[in-house]
Curated annotation (Swiss-Prot):
InterPro entries: Maltose/Cyclodextrin-bd (IPR006060), SBP (IPR006059), SBP_1_CS (IPR006061). Pfam families: SBP_bac_8. This is Maltotriose-binding protein. It comes from Pyrococcus furiosus (strain ATCC 43587 / DSM 3638 / JCM 8422 / Vc1). GO terms for cellular component: ATP-binding cassette (ABC) transporter complex, substrate-binding subunit-containing. Keywords: Signal, Sugar transport, Transport. Involved in an abc transport system for maltotriose. Binds maltotriose much more tightly than maltose. One of its GO terms (molecular function) is maltose binding. PROSITE patterns: PROKAR_LIPOPROTEIN (PS51257), SBP_BACTERIAL_1 (PS01037). Belongs to the bacterial solute-binding protein 1 family. Residues 28-52 are annotated as: Disordered. Residues 1-20 form the signal peptide. Residues 29-52 have a biased composition (Low complexity).
């Protein structure tokens, strides 16, 4: 997910333009074609194991989404499996290309769906606007423990649960196996690889790494700093640990990179074989495969400093199935959503067919998942990710962080990084208050 969704957030993402973020599907993808508005599914024969475990509701459950056609196909297939197990329930998917606007218009008038699918970045603003239905009565400690910690955090806002998680994404190192025989296990090993391949005279570089708030969050937050504290709802650019992270990036990594930090340029450098490694997310894998690169995926390695180990903490996003306020069939919707997000076979299907990174912890130990280098590699990276903030106030932070980065990039070697970050800290605070 790049942060077009986070500026949408962002990352990202943020993934939506890649400028400030990485993207998160469901929330990260913009459909390239519109599916029929309403798509009920058909049924197929259930397996005996599933029949013994499933909880069934009855009636219709309507799910709004803005998925890509290939994503929708897989979700419909899973819904068909569920309806075969539960013949009294009907799962209906409705395509809404402008999903946010559609939800904001429909839910207050009682015309919204039961469920909708998007990334976790909406949970704060939608909860604040009264557009979500709490599911506290259904959520148990045992259920929570089935999910990775980041996913547990993503599904709640200010003490209430509003959604269930089914996938995550973050950035990791994608490396060219023809150039890197053993991926780096520490930052020192990573730096040695960068030094080996850095040859700017021949337009070859040590690493490809897009430069924006989302992508460098891993290092900016590695030493305990942060852009924004979701609990206190305060920015942290002026924290010593954040300043240390920025200084580390621009003194230890930037010198081995091409001088242009935009996403497309950095990705092209790796795809053309002009860098041994790239920092990117699962959304980039199709391009890597098309380039014919023999690649692997591993988490960004820990930085060893003063005898301590500091893991890079890139922002991560979680894909959720939300419960809409005014839900018409809450019991049936809960039972389907719980099945979808906790069934090992369902989550494996999403992972193996769509490349979704599981947050159902028991699936990460599945042999098929472990043998998939992309899914397993990003899955390990998710364990070190820092959940992208959920507070609506985060919207004021992205621009400030990118502003600081752009000012540093004017002269990275001589920039007053501490002074610049403190300047933009105050700018963010002013924007939050104004």
């Amino acid at each position: 997910m790049r942060r077009a969704t986070y500026a949408f957030a962002l990352l990202a993402i943020l993934v939506l333009g890649v400028v400030a973020s990485g993207c998160i599907g469901g929330g990260t993808t913009t459909p390239t074609q519109t599916s029929p508005a309403t798509q009920p599914t058909t049924t197929q024969t259930p397996t005996q194991t599933e029949t013994q475990a499933v909880e069934c509701g009855s009636g219709k459950v309507v799910i709004w989404h803005a998925m890509q056609p290939n994503e929708l196909e897989v979700f419909q297939s899973l819904a068909e499996e569920y309806m075969a197990l539960c013949p009294e329930v009907e799962i209906v998917f409705e395509q809404k290309p402008n999903l946010e606007d559609a939800l904001k218009a429909a839910i207050p008038t009682g015309q919204g769906p039961d469920l909708f699918i998007w990334a976790h970045d909406w949970i704060g603003k939608f909860a604040e606007a009264g557009l979500l239905e709490p599911i506290d009565e259904y959520v148990t400690e045992d259920l929570l423990n089935e999910f990775a910690p980041m996913a547990q955090d993503a599904m709640q806002y200010k003490g209430h649960y509003y959604a269930l998680p089914f996938a995550a994404e973050t950035v990791a190192i994608i490396y060219n196996k023809e150039m890197v025989s053993e991926p780096p296990k520490t930052f020192d090993e990573m730096k040695a690889i960068m030094e080996k391949y850095y040859d700017p005279a021949n337009e070859k570089y040590g690493i490809a790494w897009p430069i924006n708030a989302y992508f460098i969050s891993a290092i900016a937050q590695a030493f305990g700093g942060y852009y924004f504290d979701d609990k206190t709802e305060q920015p942290g650019l002026d924290k010593p640990e954040t300043i240390e992270g920025f200084k580390f990036f621009f003194t230890e990594i930037w010198p081995y990179m091409a001088p242009t930090g935009d996403y497309n340029t950095q990705q092209s450098i790796f795809l053309e074989g002009r860098a041994p490694m790239m920092v990117n997310g699962p959304w980039s894998i199709n391009d890597v495969k098309k380039a014919g690169i023999n690649f692997g995926v591993v988490p960004l390695p820990p930085i060893i400093k003063d005898g301590k180990e500091y893991w890079p903490r890139p922002y991560g996003g979680v894909k959720l199935i939300y419960f809409a306020a005014g839900i018409k069939n809450k019991d049936a919707a809960w039972k389907f959503a719980k099945w979808l997000t906790t069934s090992e076979e369902s989550i494996k299907t999403l992972a193996l067919e769509l490349g979704y990174i599981p947050v159902l912890t028991k699936v990460l130990d599945d042999p098929e998942i472990k043998n998939d280098p992309v899914i397993y590699g990003f899955g390990q990276a998710v364990q070190h990710a820092y959940l992208m903030p959920k507070s609506p106030k985060m919207s004021a932070v992205w621009g400030g962080v990118d502003g600081a980065i752009n000012e540093i990039l004017q002269d990275p070697q001589n920039a007053d990084i501490e002074g610049i970050l403190k300047k933009y800290q105050q700018e963010i605070l002013n924007n939050m208050q104004g």
